[in-house]
């Protein structure tokens, strides 16, 4: 067991490791991922049109947590990393998101880089918890340990994915917003929902590459 843990700690990933694994996971879960994107975008657009202020974010936030949990649970099951009969960890997962998100937001409020770094160190925490391996504190600790040597590579991978997505989304929203505000709002929500879903599955990719007994999705379906 100790030798497995040491092997995980010493492993260092790069974007060239993470992106192919993420691509395989997205392909294997494409239907569910697209449903999450469409559903979250629709909820947020509708909520924004019938309410204002913080209340308008509440339906999307709740829907996001539910979609996040069940999407990564499905992806982990397809990878063979979550066994049948694993207890439902939804409420623990909610608590984990609140705790890690609050601390990461403090980092982002101080400086952008610390927030990105904290997010990278805890990128796999949700997958650790949902797979049934640990409780909330232990999941955060295990993710922190696993991702240490790869933290900046995880940040770099996020930037490689999100910067082009956000630039395209903002450009389209700006062009469409002049004549069709509703369409512009819809495009914006689709972009943000896509970024969220990719982020969730990237956490699964990082976990699947760094956990003891690492396996690549391509090997499972070979």
At which residue positions do the language-model features occur?
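Interfacial aromatic "cap" segments that immediately flank transmembrane helices
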Residues: 10-42, 86-106, 120-170
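Extended interaction regions within the primary functional domain
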Residues: 52-54, 81-89
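Juxtamembrane transition segments at transmembrane-helix termini in multipass membrane proteins
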Residues: 2-10, 59-81, 121-134, 153-222
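Short, hydrophobic transmembrane alpha-helix segments
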Residues: 45-55
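Alpha-helical transmembrane segments of multi-pass integral membrane proteins
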Residues: 36, 40, 56, 60, ...
């Amino acid at each position: 067991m100790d030798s497995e843990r040491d092997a995980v700690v010493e492993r260092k990933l790069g974007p060239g490791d993470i992106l192919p694994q993420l691509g395989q996971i997205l392909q294997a879960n494409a239907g569910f991922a697209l449903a999450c994107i469409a559903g979250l975008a629709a909820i947020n657009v509708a909520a924004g049109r019938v309410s204002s202020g913080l209340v308008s974010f509440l339906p999307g936030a709740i829907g996001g947590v539910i979609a996040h949990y069940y999407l990564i649970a499905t992806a982990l099951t397809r990878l063979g990393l979550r066994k049948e009969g694993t207890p439902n960890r939804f409420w623990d997962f909610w608590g984990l998101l609140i705790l890690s998100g609050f601390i990461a937001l403090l980092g982002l409020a101080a400086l952008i880089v610390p927030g990105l770094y904290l997010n990278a160190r805890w990128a796999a925490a949700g997958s650790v918890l949902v797979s049934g391996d640990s409780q909330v504190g232990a999941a955060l600790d295990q993710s922190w340990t696993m991702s240490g040597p790869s933290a900046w590579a995880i940040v770099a991978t996020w930037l490689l994915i999100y910067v082009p997505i956000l630039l395209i989304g903002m450009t389209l929203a700006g062009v469409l917003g002049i004549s069709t505000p509703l369409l512009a709002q819809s495009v914006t929500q689709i972009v943000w929902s896509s970024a969220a879903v990719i982020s969730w599955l990237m956490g699964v990719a990082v976990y699947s590459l760094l956990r003891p007994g690492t396996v690549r999705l391509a090997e499972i379906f070979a």
